[in-house]
Amino acid sequence: MIYLAFFKLKIIQHYLLIVALAIGLVFSYHVKAEQKQVLGSWDVHYIALNTTFLTPQVAKQNSIVRSKFNGLINISVLDRQDKTAQSVVMTGEAKNLIGVVKKLMFKQVKQGEAIYYLAVLPFSDREQYRISIDINDGLEQRTLKFQHKFYAD
């Protein structure tokens, strides 16, 4: 009985993540893990999570290797005025607390009118990163900075 409840909970977690990716961070204001920063003329929504929360199908569609030691950074950039998704170039890095730097390679994913930028970040259990991402649309350049601690599931 406990196993069945745990299994149902995992299915629900995976379903919720698929929904969040499908409709985008634009509509995830009520998700506690969702975060937003206002950078110039943009609303930048971002979330960092473990890739094990992705279903195998979603991971495969986005060429993401699911692992308890892989984190996923998902970012969307919206125009502050009309809330349209912005096509930008992202470069970034993640630095752990002992100074090891890992480059972030972002992949642009378009779903309808939504645009997401995804990067995979390998990590060790309970590893904390300072993440810095340069965002450039050719007219404006801003830097998104945040910290996140990853846990192996």
Model-inferred region functions:
Residues 1-13:
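N-terminal secretory signal peptides that target proteins for export/translocation
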Residues 15-26:
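Bacterial N-terminal signal peptides
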Residues 28-30:
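N-terminal signal peptide c-region/cleavage motif recognized by signal peptidases
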Residues 34-72:
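Beta-strand-rich domain onsets/edges
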Residues 72-78, 118-120:
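Short edge beta-strand/loop segments characteristic of extracellular beta-sandwich folds
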Residues 111-118:
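Aromatic sugar-binding surface patches on proteins
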Residues 129-136:
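Short, aromatic- and glycine-rich surface loops/edge beta-strands on solvent-exposed regions
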Residues 137-144:
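Short acidic/polar inter-strand loop motif in beta-rich domains
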